[in-house]
Amino acid sequence: MNRLRNLLPAGIAAGALVTGMALAAPAATAAQTASGRANVVTALDYNSTGWTYRQVPLTTQVPDFADRGFDDSGWPLGQAGFGTTNGTCSWNNENTVKTPWAVDTDILVRHWIHLPRDAQQVRIQGTVDNDAQVYFNGHLVQSVKSGKCAAGAIDVVVPVADLDCCNLIAVRGHDGGVATYLNLRVTYVKPTNAF
């Protein structure tokens, strides 16, 4: 019995410590949620599958390829990243290039993205070697001239007026010679529910 009395205060202290730790954990999670980090959702990730694509000569125009009603059913399906594996940039290797894109051509890529109606701050990010025109639901949202081996040049928040539940991202990648690369992702912020 004496032994039990000696252990009782230690048990209470340990219980208080565990309770304190448990109460502190939700506070850290709430702070992370308030900062928005926990609410960023990836709608389309790097190296994603399901892209339709077509390589064209540099000067070839493909009218309306970025429009939602454009028929790409005859185009092949591919996986991002698109590019060459013999270039001088760190991403021009067999681990990051999933679909070939020939040097001295342009590549047209399209992918459908479903977003919830409450999606906010829809953001397109990625890398292109050399240049790109980025479209969202047929609207040009960014023109990029990134040059050789400049990572992260594609970075744009889509205007709210361009958003819908079923969305189309389309990109025309342009090559300036030596090597090619195109890979991107789409994220959005999911609003937190008020309690």
Predicted regions and their residues:
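Short, surface-exposed beta-strand/strand-loop-strand elements in extracellular ectodomains
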Residues: D131-V141
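Extracellular beta-rich ligand/substrate-recognition surface
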Residues: W91-I107, S143-A150
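Extended extracellular/luminal ectodomain segments enriched in beta-structured repeat modules
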Residues: D104-I107, L115-R123
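Solvent-exposed loop/turn segments at secondary-structure junctions
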Residues: D129-D131, G147-C149, D175-G177
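Secretory targeting and sorting signals
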Residues: M1-A31
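Short proline/glycine-enriched turn/loop motifs at strand-loop junctions of beta-rich domains
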Residues: A119, T127-A132
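Accessory carbohydrate-binding/adhesion or oligomerization-edge regions at the termini
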Residues: A14, A27-S90, H111-H114, T127, ...
